[in-house]
Amino acid sequence: DHTRGLKFMKERLELSGMEVIAHPSCFDEKMFGEESIGAPYSAADMAGICRYRPCGGPCNISERLVFLGEIPDAVDFETRKAIGRTRIRGKWQDDYVRDDSALVYRGEEGIFIITGCSHSGICNIVQYAQAVCGQQRVLGIIGGFHLFEADERLVRTIDYLKCCGAEQIYPCHCVSLRAKARMMEVLNVKEVGVGMELCLDGQAAH
């Protein structure tokens, strides 16, 4: 669910004029055991398919939308875990998914964060989004949080999101039912479904 959809996107759409923004490591080779789990295309392939723009740091997609690039490790309880291995400059090493990133919508009243799988840690992402955008108010978060167990990390994550004042939480994939149930006890958790439409600053976001 990270990059394999690109193959089907290429089959259905003309991508030559489309700009694709991603972390520079996004298209590196990745293995989990004996299985290849990386993107179907290399960075060189992408440069020939579309207007590929590697971004290791924050970059503006539009006046309101920001791609965060690589997320720094700042929150002590969000320790990264390796998921398989990746080949960097010809050498295989543990993959800590440094290419995991997020988008931020900069609204008039605060920020709205759109995550992928949050391998970087949802609290790390929130803290970095606030710093990059210079806004503390978190209107909402939607996406995967990579939370499965009802453990200490979940408890501390819930406390963090409560303390930072996250107003609406839309947990999608990568969040277990048990984790969602615990979050609902404290946070304003919203149901997410296909076709859901959010309205930010009076503009519809599909």
What kind of region is each of these model predictions?
Residues 1-57, 71-79, 162-169:
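Active-site HxH/HxHxD metal-binding segment of metal-dependent hydrolases
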Residues 2-11, 96-102, 106-113, 117-193:
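Cap/insert and terminal regions of metallo-dependent hydrolase folds
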Residues 30, 62, 69, 75-78, ...:
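Short acidic/glycine-rich loop or secondary-structure boundary segments that cap or lie
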Residues 30-33, 149-151, 199-204:
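Short, charged, surface-exposed secondary-structure boundary motifs
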Residues 35-36, 57-108:
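Active-site-proximal loop/helix segment associated with metal-binding centers of metalloenzymes
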Residues 49-53, 64, 186-192:
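Active-site regions of enzymes building and remodeling cell-envelope glycoconjugates
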Residues 189-206:
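Short, basic/aromatic-enriched C-terminal tail that caps enzymatic domains
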